[in-house]
Design a protein with these regions (language model features):
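Catalytic histidine-centered segment of alpha/beta-hydrolase-like enzymes
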Residues: 246-260
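Active-site loop/oxyanion-hole signature of alpha/beta-hydrolase fold enzymes
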Residues: 2-15, 40-48, 52-98, 260, ...
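Short beta-strand/loop motif that positions the catalytic acidic residue
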Residues: 209, 215-217, 221
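Short beta-strand element of the alpha/beta-hydrolase
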Residues: 22-31
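Flexible "cap/lid" loop of the alpha/beta hydrolase fold
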Residues: 101-147
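Conserved alpha/beta-hydrolase catalytic His-Asp/Glu region
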Residues: 134-208
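Catalytic histidine neighborhood in serine/cysteine hydrolases
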Residues: 226-249
Length: 268
């Protein structure tokens, strides 16, 4: 599904179902050097259980045109414009990693417009080491391999999740390289990391959130370990935590737990 957002064609995956204005909607927001496909299992489940899903490719990523956001705040304004373009007065937001901060910022800016907020693999502050920031700029393929190593806690997904023989490291590395190549004008890897590293408004934003908040955390996450989310958890007025046995790419490593956890959260 393509939407005109701020004058640019913006791609949203709908989970294999046509958009139905009579149903509630969940917007999924990916992290750095990812695209809509990281949500493939969760979006398909929700789309076939009574929800509209819009899994966006952020501007300058994957199939979406436009300039890649330079900050969490800039990306949040894109998501707000996406809601306008889709004609949505109200929606649930689900974000992973950088996407979780984007979803938080949108919810803070427009609290009456967000029914539920799910922050998956999150942390605040979401600092990136200076060495990794520099590597993402000057040696992006080396940085991809390093990040990929620390983003997974298993070589293959659990049985029945993605089919026998699926290699999580290879799948994620190929995606990251593809997203990097999708925008020859801008290093979206470095730009996304800078956006995470420079974001300072997390606790201020959470203070303005009035809707239910779900934190989905991977117990073996080395990129955003659960302890790094505790400041946000403590600041959430209506928050609860779901911890799953997975690393940072928990949507792929614990797909059923994440999908069912989101589904249970969204009906409340």
């Amino acid at each position: 599904m393509l939407l005109d957002v701020n004058g640019h064609a913006t791609y949203c995956y709908t989970g294999g179902k046509p958009f139905n204005g009579a149903q509630p909607t969940v917007v999924f927001i990916h992290g750095v050097l990812n695209d809509h496909s990281v949500w493939i299992l969760q979006t398909r489940y929700l789309a076939h259980h009574g929800w509209n899903v819009l899994a966006v490719d952020l501007p300058g990523h994957g199939r979406s045109a436009g300039d890649a956001p330079e900050s969490v705040e800039a990306a949040a304004s894109v998501i707000a414009a996406l809601l306008d373009a889709a004609g949505l007065a109200r929606a649930a937001l689900v974000g992973h990693s950088w996407g979780s901060l984007i979803a938080l910022q949108v919810t803070s800016a427009q609290p009456g417009r967000v029914s539920h907020l799910a922050m998956v693999g999150t942390a605040f502050p979401m600092k990136v080491s200076p060495a990794l920031l520099d590597m993402s700029l000057h040696q992006p393929f080396k940085a991809i391999d390093l990040v990929n190593q620390f983003s997974h806690s298993m070589l293959a997904p659990p049985p029945s999740a993605m089919g026998p023989g699926t290699w999580l490291y290879g799948t994620s590395r190929a995606l990251m390289r593809r997203v990097l190549a999708s925008n020859p004008a801008v290093n979206v890897f470095h730009r996304g990391f800078q956006a995470c590293d420079s974001y300072t408004q997390g606790l201020t934003a959470m203070a303005h959130v009035r809707c239910p908040v779900l934190f989905v955390l991977g117990q073996d996450d080395q990129m955003t370990p659960p302890k790094a989310a505790q400041a946000l958890v403590s600041a959430a007025t209506h928050g609860r935590v779901l911890t799953v046995k997975a690393g940072h790419q928990l949507m792929l490593e614990a797909p059923d737990e994440v999908a069912l956890g989101l589904a249970a959260f969204l009906v409340k």
